[in-house]
């Protein structure tokens, strides 16, 4: 077995990536989320494949085909709810994974980090298009509002929107192409994940101290395969509780009403995992400004390596910047809450304050506190 593992061209690659991979001896449970994201991706592809067998991407039958899956297909209700809540679990793991990267300074592995940002955009695009497919009220109006934002682009905006729609409004052509893209993107994401891992294995993993761990490595298997398996069990338990007992808790009741272009819902909002970005978008009264802020709210992650002014890599031994980090986390929770509220006083002003705080903490306060800590420790 050892001979095959180390000499077979294909198995050798798997061996170097998941079995004999040298890993730091001190990485904590925060390093579990990479493997959990891989599991989420597999679950989403498999459940999505079975849903696609019964789904029809036509405005006349899309809503009823989803109802048919839940009522008439064997375990169709389970597959549908696993897919819907699997997206939520995917984003929970994604946010924790990115949060870990920021806390421990993993963004200094620039290629891996930038590949991760591309992956984040790809997953967000996939999730958005998937939300449109059931063709409920929130699907239709969410698609209309979000795609319409592209009309803010000077000169080509309106043409671009109509090109994406395939007509003068969100209709059959839009639904068909969204289904096509939603089907193909997870496979593109899988390819990008392999590139992400390729870059990661070029440098090796970071660790909680932020120090070089070349002198203290252990094999990935059995140590971290067992550790990851515990994470998998916890994730599956939470996931199945969510999908079996509270399947609709993260969804929108409006999406159980078939799409009606003549009846606008009182409050249009995306899924919970986009609410922080949606709140930032809405906090700027200008359309183009809002769109730029929306894109920048994710793209700002690419500036992290440039904004790193500390002589230490991780936040482990930096209490002042740690405080800033946890204020940023609290701010993201506030933005998520605001994104789900109607556009009225006092939510408007809270959203604007939280949006300013978000960019200020990342671009100004964290670099400043890092310099202060350098001076306190005489590391300048």
From Swiss-Prot:
InterPro entries: Cyt_b/b6_C (IPR005798), Cyt_b/b6_C_sf (IPR036150), Cyt_b/b6_N (IPR005797), Cytb/b6-like_sf (IPR027387), Cytochrome_b (IPR030689), Cytochrome_b_C_euk/bac (IPR048260), Cytochrome_b_N_euk/bac (IPR048259), Di-haem_cyt_TM (IPR016174). Pfam families: Cytochrom_B_C, Cytochrome_B. Its main location: mitochondrion. Heme b b562 binds at residues 83, 182. GO terms for cellular component: mitochondrial inner membrane; respiratory chain complex III. A ubiquinone binds at residue 201. SUPFAM superfamilies: a domain/subunit of cytochrome bc1 complex (Ubiquinol-cytochrome c reductase) (SSF81648), Transmembrane di-heme cytochromes (SSF81342). Belongs to the cytochrome b family. This is Cytochrome b. It comes from Alexandromys middendorffii.
């Amino acid at each position: 077995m050892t001979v095959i593992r180390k000499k077979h061209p294909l198995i050798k690659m798997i061996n170097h990536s998941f079995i004999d991979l040298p890993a730091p001896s001190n990485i904590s449970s925060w390093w579990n989320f990479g493997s959990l994201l891989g599991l989420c991706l597999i679950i989403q592809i498999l459940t999505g494949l079975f849903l696609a067998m019964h789904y029809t991407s036509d405005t006349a039958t899309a809503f009823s085909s989803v109802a048919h899956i839940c009522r008439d297909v064997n375990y169709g209700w389970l597959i549908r709810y696993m897919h819907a809540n699997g997206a939520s679990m995917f984003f929970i793991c994604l946010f924790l994974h990115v949060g870990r990267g920021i806390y421990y300074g993993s963004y200094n592995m620039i290629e891996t980090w930038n590949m991760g940002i591309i992956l984040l955009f790809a997953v967000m695009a996939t999730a958005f298009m998937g939300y449109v497919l059931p063709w409920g009220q929130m699907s239709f109006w969410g698609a209309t509002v979000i795609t319409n934002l592209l009309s803010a682009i000077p000169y080509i905006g309106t043409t671009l929107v109509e090109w994406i729609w395939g007509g003068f409004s969100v209709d059959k052509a839009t639904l068909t192409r969204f289904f096509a893209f939603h089907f193909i993107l997870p496979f593109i994401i899988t390819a990008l994940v392999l590139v992400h891992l390729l870059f990661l294995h070029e440098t090796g993993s970071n660790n909680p101290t932020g120090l070089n761990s070349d002198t203290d490595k252990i094999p990935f298997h059995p140590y971290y395969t067992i550790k990851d398996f515990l994470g998998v069990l916890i994730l599956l338990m939470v996931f199945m509780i969510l999908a079996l007992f509270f399947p609709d808790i993260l969804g929108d009741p409006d999406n159980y009403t078939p799409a009606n272009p003549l009846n606008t819902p009182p409050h249009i909002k995306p899924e919970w995992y986009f609410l922080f970005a949606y709140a930032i978008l809405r906090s700027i009264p200008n359309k183009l400004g809002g769109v730029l802020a929306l894109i920048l709210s994710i793209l700002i992650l690419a500036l992290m390596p440039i904004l790193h002014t500390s002589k230490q890599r991780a936040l482990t031994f930096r209490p002042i910047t740690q405080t800033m980090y946890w204020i940023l986390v609290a701010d993201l929770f506030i933005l998520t809450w605001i994104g789900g509220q109607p556009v009225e006083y006092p939510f408007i002003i809270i959203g604007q304050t939280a949006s300013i705080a978000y960019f200020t903490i990342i671009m100004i306060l964290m670099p400043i506190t890092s310099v202060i800590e350098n001076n306190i420790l005489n590391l300048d």
